[in-house]
Amino acid sequence: MKKLVLGLLGGFLLCLNVSAGIVADTNKTDANGKKSGFWKERSGQTDWYGDYENNLKEGLWIGYHSNGVISNLDEYKKGKRTGYCISVDKSGFLYQKDQYVNDTLNGFCIAYFTGAKLRSEIEYKMGVLNGLKRLYYSDGKKQEEGYFKNNLRHGITRWFTSDGAVSVEYTYVDGKINGKMKTFFKNGNINSEVNAVDNQEEGEYREYFENGKLKISGKYVHGKKEGAWKEMNEDGKVVKTEVYKNGELKK
């Protein structure tokens, strides 16, 4: 955070230099024809200001929207993005903040809705999704929260309703569902639960009424219904029985 603050301060001072015309010599090359010193460049609709050393970008580079509002604050080391890269919309609101090492995402990448409201937090380690991934609804409530290892889901992932309640919870191992698969009612009670092995339901399945009483019971084998499946009313009386074999209804 200290590094980010210093970078922003440097950007502020550089803005003062540009606006006051303090930097007189721009877009110069050295005796070997390599870019050196302070440069102004244009890329698409963005004007960029920053320094070159030995033909490589160095330090803080600042981009501007066509309306004069800062669009980007990017840190460079020997021509590669290293440090924070910050993006700002035309209204001046922060909408993306990434961390880089040698032009590779490393650390948290944070995105924002219009108005700088948090949209997502995703953790990278040298370009690979490793760690937390958290998504938000526009009102700030969590939409999804889980963990990754080598670009694959690993551990518990939860999805949330717009009211903030957990709606679905799966357990992953190396990108595949291995462990409990659960769904929930808005009151927090379990709606359904079953184990999974390599993305397939396996073993006992249970589905409940919102008050917690058992509604449906059955069994899966390799992702297919097997044996007797029973449906109960809220008094616990069996009101329906079906028999399956290899996923096919037999009676």
Q: Language model features by range: what are they?
A:
Residues 1-7:
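Intrinsically disordered, low-complexity terminal and linker regions enriched in polar/acidic
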Residues 7-17:
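Bacterial N-terminal signal peptides
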Residues 2, 18-161, 165-185, 189-209, ...:
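Periodic aromatic/glycine/histidine/acidic cluster detector
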